[in-house]
Swiss-Prot record:
The gene is prmA. Component of the propane 2-monooxygenase multicomponent enzyme system which is involved in the degradation of propane via the O2-dependent hydroxylation of propane. Also able to catalyze the oxidation the water contaminant N-nitrosodimethylamine (NDMA). One of its GO terms (molecular function) is monooxygenase activity. This is Propane 2-monooxygenase, hydroxylase component large subunit. Binds 2 Fe(2+) ions per subunit. Fe cation 2 binds at residues 127, 192, 226, 229. Belongs to the TmoA/XamoA family. Its cofactor is Fe(2+).
Amino acid sequence: MSRQSLTKAHAKITELSWDPTFATPATRFGTDYTFEKAPKKDPLKQIMRSYFPMEEEKDNRVYGAMDGAIRGNMFRQVQQRWLEWQKLFLSIIPFPEISAARAMPMAIDAVPNPEIHNGLAVQMIDEVRHSTIQMNLKKLYMNNYIDPAGFDMTEKAFANNYAGTIGRQFGEGFITGDAITAANIYLTVVAETAFTNTLFVAMPDEAAANGDYLLPTVFHSVQSDESRHISNGYSILLMALADERNRPLLERDLRYAWWNNHCVVDAAIGTFIEYGTKDRRKDRESYAEMWRRWIYDDYYRSYLIPLEKYGLTIPHDLVEEAWKRITDKGYVHEVARFFATGWPVNYWRIDAMTDKDFEWFEHKYPGWYSKYGKWWEEYNRLAYPGRNKPIAFEEVGYQYPHRCWTCMVPALIREDMVVEKVDDQWRTYCSETCYWTDAVAFRSEYQGRPTPNMGRLTGFREWETLHHGKDLADIVSDLGYVRDDGKTLVGQPHLDLDDPKKMWTLDDVRGNTFQSPNVLLNEMSDAERNAHIAAYRAGGAVPA
């Protein structure tokens, strides 16, 4: 289609939009933003006629690659360590995709721009397609991988797992609260423009290095749609900037959106890339190096900083703090250790780091071994049942962490934990920004201005409180993380499937009572709580 005819077709489509004059349309998805002065343009002029043939070709390539992987015996070559982590990743990622599809009607309802509506409708179809091909990828892994246990329960496990529910919080952020906050700033301006770089570009590179060339095929097909989504987000952002009343809301939302994306996406993707790989070439980029290139340089410096020319205050401090958490404070390494600590309630297996892994980590992150090496050696020592408990219940110098109420990732950088009484409950937060998000941003008033559409962070946000006082075996059984024999756990702290004696069963984990740190915190006296918090922040043992 020629550019001229495309422009004419696009203009014709916008004529189909109309506003009723006989009644005031009901506002289904509310926003506190105003758009009376907004320019109405769609720079990409997206229309269905040119869209569908392109997507059909991409789908043909994806499904052709899936067929080729089976015929080419890819599953004889792929690393088990890598595919085990895909049980968690592929249980989570289709949900944010389908949530993004659900977010598009929110944006259409909130933004008075017929041109943008067309692009948002195209994006909705994109997101449904992304979720579909990811679900098909997961099914193919399940049908062909040596250990399908975990892949076969991902939709159920995602919803009741201590890690999966972090991903659920992330995806629900696209469809809850203020429509522009959720569907545009949080989803499109930050998540899609910044963090899909590590998600859909850096991670496929790691997959290929571990013998998995299906994930790169699928996720590069996804990423090739993101330029249109970025255009949608930028167009709505410029519309919002046209009205000075929106500036405080934009600055609020950029802080919240940036920090929550960092907390969740860097925790997950950083762990998958750093701890899910067997490729330990010294010239391979670490996650910190990838982050510097894909997010700090390509997003922050090229996209975010130029917004200052519109008078917008950019959260420079939060970008620098995120970088510091990754490089200096060991954020990704703390997340990996936390996931490994929780192996009995995982639906994927996590093997111990080896000497080769130690050498690579020490090369990329000097001082890594002194902080994490001994713990991973203990993890390896306690890998098999019979003589010990699961590592979470052994004395290995690791205190089970408090959960962040906002992002739901635990407060793993312990010196930064914030404890405050909010809504008559003592809550823990991983950082000052997560506390601000709960206590200030998601409230009915912001800087003296009513913000009734923001909503609140509510619900059972701490997985641990749901299982306080239960026996570990009962928790695993209730969650459904048991193999077909009715006794062997799906999660294991090793990759040895050949010897049944090395596989942990319900009987092996029975007798260990699980306790919620937050429940215990709220039961403490003021003096006990203060002492507990001080010890936790110091990284030491909790006083008796």
